[in-house]
Swiss-Prot record:
This is Pentatricopeptide repeat-containing protein At1g07740, mitochondrial. GO terms for cellular component: mitochondrion. The lineage of its organism: Eukaryota, Viridiplantae, Streptophyta, Embryophyta, Tracheophyta. It is found in: Mitochondrion. PPR repeats lie at residues 80-114, 115-149, 150-184, 185-219, 220-254, 255-289, 290-324, 325-359, 360-394, 395-429. InterPro entries: Pentatricopeptide_rpt, TPR-like_helical_dom_sf. It comes from Arabidopsis thaliana (Mouse-ear cress). Residues 19-41 are annotated as: Disordered. NCBIfam families: PPR.
Length: 459
C-alpha cells in the first residue's frame, strides 16, 4: 500500500524528535507482503547490511522506492542517514525533485546529521537538470542540516554553474569564498580557468592563473593542461611549449595528456614527425607514452591515408608491452573501412577479440558500414548478428543500408530478418530514414526494386 509522504510528515509531528543511528525490532506486520514489501527481521549485527538498503537496490521505479520507505517506517524501522541518503540519491537520479524536497524536510525534522557528500551529489543532479537556482539553494542550506560546508561543496557548485553557462555567478561565488571562511584550492581555480577558456576568453583565464599564483596556490598539471590545450587548439604552439617548460621549472611533472595535447597540436599543423619525436622525448622527461599518445599518431596517419604506418605503430605498442584498447583498434578499423580495406579491418576485429579486447557499438557499426560500402551484405549481416548478440544496436542509418543492400541482392528473407530485429528492439527508421530507403530503391534505380520493397514490408 502506498502512502504519500506529506501525510507521513503530518503524522510524524506527534513523534518526539530524536536522532536515529540504529534499527529496532518492530511489531510483526499483519498485512500480506507485496513483491517489494520488507520481510526482514530488523535485529542485525553491526557488520550486516541494512535490510532497507538491500531492498532499495532492487528497485528502479522511484515511486516504488518511496512506497518501500513508507512501508519500513510503518513497520517500526527507524531510518538513519544511510537510508535517507540512498533514497535521496535514487530520487534525484530520476529527477523526482519534489520528493527529494519532502525527504529533506523529514531529515531536518528528525535531526539526522548528514554528510557534505549528500549535498554535493544533489547539487550535481540539479546541475544536470539545468536547475541552477535549486543547486544554489541546496548549497546555502547545507549548514542548516548540522553539516560543515567545505571548499569541496563550493567547488561542486562552481563547476555546476560553469557547466550551465553561468560563469559570472561562478566567479561571484568564487570571490565570496573568503566571506564563507573558505580558501580556494587548485580545483577552484582550475574550474574557473576551464570556464573562461571554454568561452575563448584567454585574458580572463590568465588573470585567474595570476591570481592563483598571488594567493600562493600551487598550479596542478590539470591547470597547465587546460592552458596548453587551449593554445594548441588555437595554433599557438610557441606559447604552449613555453608553458611546458614553465611547469617543468616549477617541478610540476607533465603527464601523458600534456604531451598528447602538444602532439595533437603539431599533427594539426602537419608536423607529424615532430609529434612523433615529442612522444619519444617525453620518456626522457620521466613520462612513459600511453594509449592517448599512440592514438593521436595513429589517427593522424589514418586521416592522411598512411594506414600501413598506423599498423606499424600498433606493432610497436605491443613490443613496448602497451596493451591496445578498443579506442586504438577502432582507429584502425575506421580508416581501413573508409579506404574499403574491409577484410583487413575484419582481421583487426578478430585480433582484438582474441587479445581479450571487447568490441563496442562503434566497432560493429563501422564494420557493418564497411561491408555495406563494398556491397558484401552477407558478411555485414554476420557482423550484425554478432553485434546484437553483444547487446549493442546499430543506428537506423546502418539498418537502412543493410535492408537496401539485401533487397538489391535479392535476399528478401534476410531483409525481412533485419526489419524483424528492428521490431523486436522497438526501433523504427523514422521518416527521414524511410525516405532514404525509398529514394535508394524506388527512385535512383528507376523503381526496379519497388516491388521487392513492397513484398518485404508486406511480410
Amino acid at each position: 500500500m502506498r502512502r504519500r509522504l506529506s501525510s507521513v510528515l503530518i503524522n510524524n509531528q506527534c513523534i518526539a524528535s530524536q536522532r536515529h543511528y540504529h534499527t529496532s525490532r518492530p511489531e510483526k506486520p499483519t498485512k500480506k507482503a507485496s513483491s517489494h514489501e520488507p520481510t526482514h527481521k530488523f535485529t542485525r549485527k553491526p557488520w550486516e547490511e541494512v535490510p532497507f538498503l538491500t531492498d532499495l537496490k532492487e528497485i528502479e521505479d522511484p515511486e516504488e522506492a518511496l512506497s518501500l520507505f513508507h512501508q519500513y517506517q510503518e513497520m517500526g524501522f527507524r531510518h538513519d542517514y544511510p537510508s535517507y541518503s540512498s533514497l535521496i540519491y535514487k530520487l534525484a537520479k530520476s529527477r523526482n525533485f519534489d520528493a527529494v524536497d519532502q525527504i529533506l524536510r523529514l531529515v531536518r525534522y528528525r535531526n539526522v546529521r548528514c554528510r557534505e557528500s549528500l549535498f554535493m551529489g544533489l547539487i550535481q543532479h540539479y546541475g544536470k537538470a539545468g536547475s541552477v537556482d535549486k543547486a544554489i539553494d541546496v548549497f546555502h542550506k547545507i549548514t542548516s542540516f548540522d553539516c560543515v560546508r567545505t571548499i569541496q561543496s563550493l567547488n561542486t557548485l562552481i563547476n555546476v554553474l560553469v557547466d550551465n553557462g553561468e560563469l559570472e555567478k561562478a566567479k561571484s561565488f568564487f570571490d565570496g569564498a573568503k566571506d564563507m571562511r573558505l580558501r580556494p584550492n587548485s580545483v577552484s581555480f582550475n574550474i574557473l580557468i576551464k570556464g573562461f577558456l571554454d568561452k575563448c576568453d584567454w585574458e580572463a583565464a590568465c588573470k585567474v592563473f595570476d591570481e592563483m599564483l598571488e594567493m600562493e596556490v600551487q598550479p596542478s598539471v590539470v591547470t597547465y593542461n587546460s592552458l596548453i590545450g587551449f593554445l594548441c587548439r588555437n595554433d599557438d604552439m610557441g606559447k604552449a611549449k613555453s608553458l611546458l617548460e614553465d611547469m617543468i621549472k616549477k617541478r610540476i611533472r607533465p603527464n601523458a595528456v600534456t604531451f598528447g595535447l602538444l602532439m595533437k597540436g603539431l599533427c594539426c599543423k602537419g608536423e607529424y614527425n615532430e609529434a612523433k619525436k615529442l612522444m619519444f622525448d617525453m620518456e626522457y622527461r620521466g613520462c612513459k607514452p600511453g594509449l592517448v599518445n599512440y592514438g593521436i599518431l595513429m589517427s593522424d596517419l589514418g586521416k592522411r591515408g598512411r594506414i600501413d604506418e598506423a599498423k606499424l605503430l600498433l606493432g610497436e605498442m605491443k613490443k613496448r608491452r602497451i596493451k591496445p584498447d578498443v579506442v586504438i583498434y577502432n582507429i584502425l578499423v575506421n580508416h581501413l573501412c573508409t579506404e574499403c580495406r574491409v577484410p583487413e579491418a575484419y582481421r583487426v576485429l578478430t585480433e582484438m577479440q582474441m587479445k581479450g579486447c571487447k568490441p563496442n557499438a562503434a566497432t560493429y557499426r563501422m564494420m557493418i558500414d564497411g561491408f555495406c560500402r563494398i556491397e558484401d551484405f552477407d558478411s555485414g549481416l554476420n557482423v550484425l548478428n554478432a553485434m546484437l548478440a553483444s547487446r549493442h544496436c546499430p543506428t537506423p542509418a546502418t539498418f537502412v543500408c543493410m535492408v537496401a543492400g539485401l533487397i538489391k541482392g535479392g535476399n528478401l528473407d534476410h531483409a525481412c530478418f533485419v526489419l524483424e530485429v528492428m521490431g523486436k528492439k522497438n526501433l523504427s527508421f523514422g521518416s527521414g530514414a524511410w525516405q532514404n530507403l525509398l529514394s535508394d530503391l524506388c527512385i535512383k534505380d528507376g523503381g526496379v526494386y519497388c516491388e521487392a520493397l513492397s513484398e518485404v514490408i508486406s511480410i
